[in-house]
Amino acid sequence: MSILYALVARGTVVLAELSTTSTNASTIAKQILEKIPGNGDSHVSYSQDRYVFHVKRTDGLTVLCMADEDAGRRIPFSFLEDIHQRFVRTYGRAIHSAQAYAMNDEFSRVLNQQIEYYSNDPNADTISRIKGEMNQVRDVMIENIDNILDRGERLELLVDKTANMQGNTFRFRKQTRRFNNTVWWRNCKLTLLLILVLLVIIYIGVAFACHGPTLPSCV
């Protein structure tokens, strides 16, 4: 699974979050929220080990996710843009005064649904390319997390690799099933075509023997 963790926060106040595996990403994400420089809008990524924390902040609302480094940047930032729009559309002005985790019970289900989509559905990346969204992602520099955390604050990122492998296995099975379905339909079409050709050949032979296409001497 490409995306393993996500949160939505106002400043350092976490409003909703979800982790798809056993990890301490939440603790590290909260450290990042406290250390993000400046007050303006930003798109930034921080790497740690084989994982990258991607951050999008717009109008004081921060959306963050942790993904495998091989997920690249387009899919994670497309995910963040999607989550930002859904969150603002759902809660509006309530965002500015909500208490910590006020939206967690409801919106964590949305996070789970969209993480599943952006991690496993190949259409997610295709749609992002067609829309031409997130052009600014090209300019996002991936920094090491040590650049914003003091040496004494840095925590080792712990990820349950068993759960991660299960996600990869699920994706492989899904792709295999899709491939098998494609092959099955192709074989069905080929079989139908051969049957049609065979029927045409039989008809031509019968029509020739019966002296005409309406089979006058055989009817």
Curated annotation (Swiss-Prot):
Q: How does it sit in the membrane?
A: Single-pass type IV membrane protein
* Keyword DNA repair appears in the UniProt entry: no
Read off the InterPro entries from this record.
Answer: Longin-like_dom_sf (IPR011012), Longin_dom (IPR010908), Synaptobrevin-like (IPR001388), Synaptobrevin-like_transport (IPR051097), V_SNARE_CC (IPR042855)
What does the record say about tissue specificity? Expressed in flowers, leaves, stems and roots.
Domain v-SNARE coiled-coil homology as annotated: residue spans:
126-186
The cellular location(s) given in this protein's UniProt record come to: Vacuole membrane; Prevacuolar compartment membrane
UniProt-listed CDD domains? Longin, R-SNARE
Annotated Longin domain ranges read 7-111
Pfam families named among the record's database cross-references: Longin (PF13774), Synaptobrevin (PF00957)
Q: Which residues lie on this side of the membrane: Vesicular?
A: 211-219
Q: Which domain of life is it from?
A: Eukaryota
Where mainly located?
A: membrane
One GO biological-process annotation of the entry reads: protein transport
Q: Which family does it belong to?
A: Belongs to the synaptobrevin family.
Q: What is this protein called?
A: Vesicle-associated membrane protein 712
What would be the name of the gene that encodes this protein?
A: VAMP712
